[in-house]
């Protein structure tokens, strides 16, 4: 398909088609073309949401694969099956290569096009949060100096987003709430700081609760969903019996204004 010749509107439409067909790699390609054609202006809310959906689905499949393979690897190591462990490590490496390529792709797009062209506080927070998310995904599987670098870059991006969000966005704004949710997950999972994670999540939840009556009808569903996820994580993190492996830490969902997914 000669998609290089498509107009901005046609690429957006093709991205929607690809989403309906669950062909997310192609959805990424269409939305990257859109993003690279708007150096002097911002993406629309719809466009940035489509880009976010595309990448979140592409990365989400690999993150799930990595977690499953890593779990199997631990079990085989426990059984002393070294031959199988060697096979699993090679396979895990293949998934990690794919994860790295995906993260590098969106991070480059964010740094060269999306963050520099953003002017509205909402879009700045959206893209800086996204930048933090993809550095966090790198920190999930990288080791040594690479993990340290990814974690530091995550912190810088989330902190920059937080500074703008606290100054410019209402406590009930779904993008501000989604940032608090994912930032707290970063503290818990990557930095191993449960106290800081709980503090951040609780503050965001409490501030939003106190201003619930100011919620607009259009963002009510998104905001209350993320607030529920914040509360779920707080319950999980503060419980002494939270070691059930079936329990899953919640991140901003695939369909909300904070991630646009």
Curated annotation (Swiss-Prot):
One of its GO terms (cellular component) is cytoplasm. This is 14-3-3-like protein GF14-6. Gene3D superfamilies: 14-3-3 domain. GO terms for molecular function: DNA binding; protein-containing complex binding. Is associated with a DNA binding complex to bind to the G box, a well-characterized cis-acting DNA regulatory element found in plant genes. PROSITE patterns: 1433_1, 1433_2. The lineage of its organism: Eukaryota, Viridiplantae, Streptophyta, Embryophyta, Tracheophyta. GO terms for biological process: protein localization; regulation of gene expression; signal transduction. It comes from the Eukaryota. Belongs to the 14-3-3 family.
